[in-house]
Amino acid sequence: MNTKFTVLIFLGVIVVSYGWITEKKIQKVLDEKLPNGFIKGAAKAVVHKLAKSEYGCMMDISWNKDCQRHCQSTEQKDGICHGMKCKCGKPRSY
């Protein structure tokens, strides 16, 4: 069960990152298909967090190295993921 859920999450990240489906469309489908409650709220929160990801950053890792490329091209600094955000030249202090 956990493996299937993880695969679905990563497939969702891929689809959303390429812009085929936007966060707004996914949130609308969740509103229509899921009953109000914990599961709906959790699913909407996961979709929102994944949609906020910058330059492929997830869990402090830039999976496709877009953060590094972005920072090298704009500021000539190292790109470092801080959670879901990409920061140029700011090392993690934890």
Curated annotation (Swiss-Prot):
One of its GO terms (molecular function) is toxin activity. InterPro entries: Long_scorpion_toxin_alpha/beta. Disulfide bonds join C57-C81, C67-C86, C71-C88. Residues 54-94 form the BetaSPN-type CS-alpha/beta domain. Coiled coil: none annotated. Belongs to the long chain scorpion toxin family. Class 3 subfamily. This is Scorpine-like-1. It comes from Urodacus yaschenkoi.
